[in-house]
């Protein structure tokens, strides 16, 4: 029987275009340092991570350009919607990510922003390489063909 305090993982924001625009090599789960009004605003489900990315500054990884709108009930202690947010990772993970970005020309992009079973805000971060236009077209052709194949199989019975 499940614990009373255990909650399911609840995805609050997802970057759907990331899998189309990037070839994803590896994913990693990172904590994210937030203020109280940011957590409440994310729980309202209005945040977006579609045009955001992660970057390294002074040996730390920061989430840049993620939009978490102001919490409506928050008064003068509200947060700035597009401020850089620190990602919480182990030193070994940070070194691995910085190495991939610096040496191999990879990009760090967020895939999902969610609350885990313990109610903590987490970010699924991907180490990815940008796709060229012809790669995107190829991905689209494969997707269309698999859709068409499914239709044909359903039609045949």
Swiss-Prot record:
GO terms for cellular component: cytosol. Keywords: Cytoplasm, RNA-binding. It comes from the Bacteria. It is found in: Cytoplasm. Residues 135-151 have a biased composition (Basic and acidic residues). SUPFAM superfamilies: Small protein B (SmpB). PROSITE patterns: SSRP. GO terms for molecular function: RNA binding. Residues 133-157 are annotated as: Disordered. CDD domains: SmpB. InterPro entries: SmpB, SsrA-bd_prot, SsrA-bd_prot_CS. Its main location: cytoplasm. Coiled coil: none annotated. Required for rescue of stalled ribosomes mediated by trans-translation. Binds to transfer-messenger RNA (tmRNA), required for stable association of tmRNA with ribosomes. tmRNA and SmpB together mimic tRNA shape, replacing the anticodon stem-loop with SmpB. tmRNA is encoded by the ssrA gene; the 2 termini fold to resemble tRNA(Ala) and it encodes a 'tag peptide', a short internal open reading frame. During trans-translation Ala-aminoacylated tmRNA acts like a tRNA, entering the A-site of stalled ribosomes, displacing the stalled mRNA. Belongs to the SmpB family. This is SsrA-binding protein. It comes from Bradyrhizobium diazoefficiens (strain JCM 10833 / BCRC 13528 / IAM 13628 / NBRC 14792 / USDA 110).
């Amino acid at each position: 029987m499940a614990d009373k305090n255990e909650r399911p993982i609840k995805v609050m924001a997802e970057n759907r275009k990331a899998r189309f625009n990037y070839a994803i090599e590896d994913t990693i789960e990172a904590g994210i340092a937030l203020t109280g009004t940011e957590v409440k605003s994310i729980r309202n489900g209005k945040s977006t991570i579609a045009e955001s990315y992660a970057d390294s500054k002074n040996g730390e990884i920061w989430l840049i350009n993620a939009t978490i709108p102001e919490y409506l009930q928050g008064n003068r202690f509200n947060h700035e919607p597009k401020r850089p947010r620190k990602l919480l990772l182990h030193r070994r993970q940070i070194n691995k990510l910085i190495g991939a970005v610096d040496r191999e020309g990879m990009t760090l992009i967020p895939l999902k922003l969610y609350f885990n079973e313990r109610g903590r805000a987490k970010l699924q971060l991907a180490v990815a390489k940008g796709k060229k236009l012809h790669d995107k077209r190829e991905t689209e052709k494969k997707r269309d063909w698999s859709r068409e194949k499914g239709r044909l199989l359903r039609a045949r019975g």
